[in-house]
From Swiss-Prot:
It comes from the Bacteria. Part of the 50S ribosomal subunit. Contacts protein L29, and trigger factor when it is bound to the ribosome. One of the early assembly proteins it binds 23S rRNA. One of the proteins that surrounds the polypeptide exit tunnel on the outside of the ribosome. Forms the main docking site for trigger factor binding to the ribosome. Keywords: Ribonucleoprotein, Ribosomal protein, RNA-binding, rRNA-binding. Signal peptide: none annotated. It comes from Buchnera aphidicola subsp. Baizongia pistaciae (strain Bp). Disulfide bonds: none annotated. This is Large ribosomal subunit protein uL23. Belongs to the universal ribosomal protein uL23 family. One of its GO terms (molecular function) is structural constituent of ribosome.
Amino acid sequence: MIYEKILLKVLLGPHISEKSSTLSGNFSTVIIKVSICATKLEIKRAVQNMFNVAVKNVNTLVVQGKCKRKKSRITCSSNWKKAYVTLKRGQNINFIGSSE
C-alpha cells in the first residue's frame, strides 16, 4: 500500500510536443515528466501499474532549468526530469483520448 502511493508520486504528467507525438506514432514511445529523484525501475513499475501496459525500455534525462533576466533580477526555473518510455509491440498509451 505504501509502495503504491510512492509510485503515484513518480509520474507528474505527459510531455506534449511535436517530437513526442512523432515518437508515439512511429515508435510506440511516450515522453513523461517524472519526479527528479525517480529511478528507471520506479518509472517502469509506475507506468505498468497505472496504465496496464508492458514496458520494454526506459531512458531518462534531466532538463536543465533556464535563467531569464527581468530588469535587474535574474530568475531561474528549476531542473526537471523526463522519461522516454518505450512500450512493447502492440501496446499504446493515449493521453489525449480519441473520439473514435
